[in-house]
C-alpha cells in the first residue's frame, strides 16, 4: 500500500467501484429486516452548501451503519425541482426554468457523488417531470371526486402595473419587486384541499410519534390549534344578520364591552357606505398583508362602524368596531372583546377609550388592578350577576349552558388550522388538473388527458406565466365540449408531500404507488431535515400519508417513525463599512485574522487592507457572504475529512461551528489511522489471535478495544451521538499508536483492533475505510462487512482498583483481583509502603470494606 494518505487518489476510485457494482441499489427482500433512511430532498439551486452536506452526511452515516447490521437499507435521493427561484434565475440568465433546473441537477448530482453518499441512484426522481407529477394530478382529481378539494376566493398580492400575482417574497416594503408599484390585496378564486377534515387525526396521532422531537410536535399542536369554546350569536340593531363570535373564555362573557369585525366583514362593508373614515380604513387593511405571526406585534387600529350589538345576557348595547387584528379567513371574521381579561382587547380599548369591565377576581380574591394591563389568569367570577362566585370551570359551563338554553350559544370545537390553499399563479409548477366548460361547469381533467404537461420550451418575461400568456395552451375539449384548462399550478409543497413514497417504486406505471413495495419500505425509519420545516412540509407530509392510506395505497398511519432535525452550520462573519456607509461582507476565507491566547479573533483585515468588523459566528448565508463551498474543502482535504469533521464537531441536532482548524484536525487523524495501518501491514503476515495466551497488558488493550466497540455501537445505534462515537475511536487510536509490536500476539491484537477501527469509521469515512479494509485483508468488501461485535468476555475486568484509607484519609490505591477476599485485600494493602507507614506501631481497631472499591482501616 502507498505510505501517504492521498484522498484525491483513492476517493474517485472507490466511487467508481460503487457505481460499477451498483453497491447501494436495493430491492424488496422479505427475508431481511428493512431500514429506510431518508434525508429531505434538495432544491436544485445550483450548488450544494454546507447545510446540505451536514444533512446528507448524517443520513449516510446512519444508512451505512444499519447496512453493516445486516439490514436491507434504502437510501434514495431526488430533486424538489419546481419553484419560484428557477423563474427568477431564468429571467436573469435569459433562459427557461427547465434547462436551468436540469443543468443544476446534473452539477449537484456530481457534487453528491464526490462526497461519497451511498444512494440508490436507480430511484432518483425529479419532481418537475411529467412522469412524477402525473400521479399527483390524478390523485388530486380523485380527492376532488371525494369532496376533499374545493374552490373559493382568497386574497393574493396583486401588482396593478404588471397585472400579475406576486409571491410574498416578491413584495418588498409593500411594493412590487420589479416595478416598485404599490401592491394591492385582491380576491381571486383558488383551489383548496380539506386538511381540516383530518385535523383531529393529525393532532391525536402526534402521540404515536415517540421518536419525533417534542419541539416539532408542540409546533404542530399549536399550529392545528384545537380549542373548546362557545359560538355566540348577537343581534345587531339595524343589521339584518346576526353577528357570530367564537370564544374559549365564556367565563368572562359578562365583561364583553365591544365586538370587533374584520375589515372585509359584510357588516363593515355595509357601514362603510356612509362612513368615509371606515371606507378608507377598509381600503388600508385590504392592501396590507398581515402574516399571522406579525399580529401580536403590529399596531392595533380600528374604526367604529356605528352599529350596536345587544349583549344577550345583560341586554346592554355594545359598539361594533372594525379592527385590523381580526382576519376574515379565521373563524367567523368577528370576535368578542373582553378588555379586562385579554391584553390585546385591553390595548385597543385603552387606545380608543372603550369601556373596560373587570369580571374575574385576582388570585388573592381582590378586585383586579386594571390600571396598566389586563388580568388574563383564570379565577373566580364577580360582577357577573347570577354567575358571580363561580370558579373558572363552573362559570364556563354555567354561561355556556345558559346561552344554549336561550338558543344563542353552542359549544364548539375550533381549529386554528386552515384548509391548504394549493393554487399558485406561477409558471414553474405542476398544472392543476381542472377544466371549466363554456357554461361555467368545473370538472376534473379526464384521466385519458393526464398528465396535463407543463410546456418547458418557453420564454420568460418576468411578469406573466407563459401558460397564462398563451391563450392556446388552455384550450381543450372534454366530452366533445370546448373547455379551458386551469392555468394556476400547484404549491410546490404538493410534490414534497409524497416523494418519499414514490421512491419505493419510482418506475411503477400502473398508478401512484405499488402498494406491495410501498408497504415493504414504509414507514420511513428515520427522516432527517431542518426544523424550519416543522409545520408546513412536515404537516403536509403527514396529511398526504393519511390521504394515501385512505385511498388504499399504504397501510400505515404515519410516514416516518423517527425525525432527526439537524442543527444549522455557522461560520465567522466579517464586514467593512464602504464609502457610503454600507456594509460589505467579506468571506471568512478572505479574512486575515489575529487571535488572542484563547484563540478568539481580536483583529481582522482583507487582502485589500480593509479593517474588518467581526460579528461572530452566524448561520452560513449569501447575505453575509460567509458560506464555505463544500467543493473547495473536498478538493483541499478529501470527502472523508469533511464528513468526519461534520460529524465530530457537534452533536447532530445542535448548531455546528465551521472551523477550518477543526477540518485540519480531522485530516491529521485520518493520516494517523492510515500511517498505523501502513506500518502494521508492511511487517508482513499476522498470526491468529490466541486470547488464552495474552499477557496482562495485552488483555488490558483488548479490553479497551472491545469497550470502544460497545460504546461506539451504543453511541451510533441507540443514542445517535455521533461525535462521542468518533471521540471514542480517537481515544482508542491513541492507545494503539503506543501499543508495543514486539511479539506475534501484539501484532495479532493490532490486526483485530485495526479491522474494528476501520469498520467503525466506515459510516463516517467510507473511502478510506474501503481502501484500508482491503489492505488489512478484510473479508470481501467493507460495504458488505458486518459491524464489529464487542466480545463480552474481553470486557470483563479481572482486576479492580481499591482506594485505601487510614482513619478516613486516602493513603493509597491498590490493584487486586476482582474476586479477592477482604483478607487478601487487607494483606495487599499492608504491602503498599505508603499505607504501611501509617500503620506502623498502631493497632487496627476496625475495618470498613466496600468490596472492590474501598478499604478503610481505623487505627489507634
Swiss-Prot record:
The keyword Isomerase does not apply. It is found in: Cytoplasm. A motif ('HIGH' region) lies at residues 42-52. It catalyses: tRNA(Leu) + L-leucine + ATP = L-leucyl-tRNA(Leu) + AMP + diphosphate. The keyword ATP-binding applies. It comes from Klebsiella pneumoniae (strain 342). Belongs to the class-I aminoacyl-tRNA synthetase family. This is Leucine--tRNA ligase. Keywords: Aminoacyl-tRNA synthetase, ATP-binding, Cytoplasm, Ligase, Nucleotide-binding, Protein biosynthesis. GO terms for cellular component: cytosol. Its EC number is 6.1.1.4. It holds the Pfam family tRNA-synt_1. One of its GO terms (molecular function) is leucine-tRNA ligase activity. A motif ('KMSKS' region) lies at residues 619-623. PANTHER family: LEUCINE--TRNA LIGASE, MITOCHONDRIAL, LEUCYL-TRNA SYNTHETASE. ATP binds at residue 622.
Amino acid at each position: 500500500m502507498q505510505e501517504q494518505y492521498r484522498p484525491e487518489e483513492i476517493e474517485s476510485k472507490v466511487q467508481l467501484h460503487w457505481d460499477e457494482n451498483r453497491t447501494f441499489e436495493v430491492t424488496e427482500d422479505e427475508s431481511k429486516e428493512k431500514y429506510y433512511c431518508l434525508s429531505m430532498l434538495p432544491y436544485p439551486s445550483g450548488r450544494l452548501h454546507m447545510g446540505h452536506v451536514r444533512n446528507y452526511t448524517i443520513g449516510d452515516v446512519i444508512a451505512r451503519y444499519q447496512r453493516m447490521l445486516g439490514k436491507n437499507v434504502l437510501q434514495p435521493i431526488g430533486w424538489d425541482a419546481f419553484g419560484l427561484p428557477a423563474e427568477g434565475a431564468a429571467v436573469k440568465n435569459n433562459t427557461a426554468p427547465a434547462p436551468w433546473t436540469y443543468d443544476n441537477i446534473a452539477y449537484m448530482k456530481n457534487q453528491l457523488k464526490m462526497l461519497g453518499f451511498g444512494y440508490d441512484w436507480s430511484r432518483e426522481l425529479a419532481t418537475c417531470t411529467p412522469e412524477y407529477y402525473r400521479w399527483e394530478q390524478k390523485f388530486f382529481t380523485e380527492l376532488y371526486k371525494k369532496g376533499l378539494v374545493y374552490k373559493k376566493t382568497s386574497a393574493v398580492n396583486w401588482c396593478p402595473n404588471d397585472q400579475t400575482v406576486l409571491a410574498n417574497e416578491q413584495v418588498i416594503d409593500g411594493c412590487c419587486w420589479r416595478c416598485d408599484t404599490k401592491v394591492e390585496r385582491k380576491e381571486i378564486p383558488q383551489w383548496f384541499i380539506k386538511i381540516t377534515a383530518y385535523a383531529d387525526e393529525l393532532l391525536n396521532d402526534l402521540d404515536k410519534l415517540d421518536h419525533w422531537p417534542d419541539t416539532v410536535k408542540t409546533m404542530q399542536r399549536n399550529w392545528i390549534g384545537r380549542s373548546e369554546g362557545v359560538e355566540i350569536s348577537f343581534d345587531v340593531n339595524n343589521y339584518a344578520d346576526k353577528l357570530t363570535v367564537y370564544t374559549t373564555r365564556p367565563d368572562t362573557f359578562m365583561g364583553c364591552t365591544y365586538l370587533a369585525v374584520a375589515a372585509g366583514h359584510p357588516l363593515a362593508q355595509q357601514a362603510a357606505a356612509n362612513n368615509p373614515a371606515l371606507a378608507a380604513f377598509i381600503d388600508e387593511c385590504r392592501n396590507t398583508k398581515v402574516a399571522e405571526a406579525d399580529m401580536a406585534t403590529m399596531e392595533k387600529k380600528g374604526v367604529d362602524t356605528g352599529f350596536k350589538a345587544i349583549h344577550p345576557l345583560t341586554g346592554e348595547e355594545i359598539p361594533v368596531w372594525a379592527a385590523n387584528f381580526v382576519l376574515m379567513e379565521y373563524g367567523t371574521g368577528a370576535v368578542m372583546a373582553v378588555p379586562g381579561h385579554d391584553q390585546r382587547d385591553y390595548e385597543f380599548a385603552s387606545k380608543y377609550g372603550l369601556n373596560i369591565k373587570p369580571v374575574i377576581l385576582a388570585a388573592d380574591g381582590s378586585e383586579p388592578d386594571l390600571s396598566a394591563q389586563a388580568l388574563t389568569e383564570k379565577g373566580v367570577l364577580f360582577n357577573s350577576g347570577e354567575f358571580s362566585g363561580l370558579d373558572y370551570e363552573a362559570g364556563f359551563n354555567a354561561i355556556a349552558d345558559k346561552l344554549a338554553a336561550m338558543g344563542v350559544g353552542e359549544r364548539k370545537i375550533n381549529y386554528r388550522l386552515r384548509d391548504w390553499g394549493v393554487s399558485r399563479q406561477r409558471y414553474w409548477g405542476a398544472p392543476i388538473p381542472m377544466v371549466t366548460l363554456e357554461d361555467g361547469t368545473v370538472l376534473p381533467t379526464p384521466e385519458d388527458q393526464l398528465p396535463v404537461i407543463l410546456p418547458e420550451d418557453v420564454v420568460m418575461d418576468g411578469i406573466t406565466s407563459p401558460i397564462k400568456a398563451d391563450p392556446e395552451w388552455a384550450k381543450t375539449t372534454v366530452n366533445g365540449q370546448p373547455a379551458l384548462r386551469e392555468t394556476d399550478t400547484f404549491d410546490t409543497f404538493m410534490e414534497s408531500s409524497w416523494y418519499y413514497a414514490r421512491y419505493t417504486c419510482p418506475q411503477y406505471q400502473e398508478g401512484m404507488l405499488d402498494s406491495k413495495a410501498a408497504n415493504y419500505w414504509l414507514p420511513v425509519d428515520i427522516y432527517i431535515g431542518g426544523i424550519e420545516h416543522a409545520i408546513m412540509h412536515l404537516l403536509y407530509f403527514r396529511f398526504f400519508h393519511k390521504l394515501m392510506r385512505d385511498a388504499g395505497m399504504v397501510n400505515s398511519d404515519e410516514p416516518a417513525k423517527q425525525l432527526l432535525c439537524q442543527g444549522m452550520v455557522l461560520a465567522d462573519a466579517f464586514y467593512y463599512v464602504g464609502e457610503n456607509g454600507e456594509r460589505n461582507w467579506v468571506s471568512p476565507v478572505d479574512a486575515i485574522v489575529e487571535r488572542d491566547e484563547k484563540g478568539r479573533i481580536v483583529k481582522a483585515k482583507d487582502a485589500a487592507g480593509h479593517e474588518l468588523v467581526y460579528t461572530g459566528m452566524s448561520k452560513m448565508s449569501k447575505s453575509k457572504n460567509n458560506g464555505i463551498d463544500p467543493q473547495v474543502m473536498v478538493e483541499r482535504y478529501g470527502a472523508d475529512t469533511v464528513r468526519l469533521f461534520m460529524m465530530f464537531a457537534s452533536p447532530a441536532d445542535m448548531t455546528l461551528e465551521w472551523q477550518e482548524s477543526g477540518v485540519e484536525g480531522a485530516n491529521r487523524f485520518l493520516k494517523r489511522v492510515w500511517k498505523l495501518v501502513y506500518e502494521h501491514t508492511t511487517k508482513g503476515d499476522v498470526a491468529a489471535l490466541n486470547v488464552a495466551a495474552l499477557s496482562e497488558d495485552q488483555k488490558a488493550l483488548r479490553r479497551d478495544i472491545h469497550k470502544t466497540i460497545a460504546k461506539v455501537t451504543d453511541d451510533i445505534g441507540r443514542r445517535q451521538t455521533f461525535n462521542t462515537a468518533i471521540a471514542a475511536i480517537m481515544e482508542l487510536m491513541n492507545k494503539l499508536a503506543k501499543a508495543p509490536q514486539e511479539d506475534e500476539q501484539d501484532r495479532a491484537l493490532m490486526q483485530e483492533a485495526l479491522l474494528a477501527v476501520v469498520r467503525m469509521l466506515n459510516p463516517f469515512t467510507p473511502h478510506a475505510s474501503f481502501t484500508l479494509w482491503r489492505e488489512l485483508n478484510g473479508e470481501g468488501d467493507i460495504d458488505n462487512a458486518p459491524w464489529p461485535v464487542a466480545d463480552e468476555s474481553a470486557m470483563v475486568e479481572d482486576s479492580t482498583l481499591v482506594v485505601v484509607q487510614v482513619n478516613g484519609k486516602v493513603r493509597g490505591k491498590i490493584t487486586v483481583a476482582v474476586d479477592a477476599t477482604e483478607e487478601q485485600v487487607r494483606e495487599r494493602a499492608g504491602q503498599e509502603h505508603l499505607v504501611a507507614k501509617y500503620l506502623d506501631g498502631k493497632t487496627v481497631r476496625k475495618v470498613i470494606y466496600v468490596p472492590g472499591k474501598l478499604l478503610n482501616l481505623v487505627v489507634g
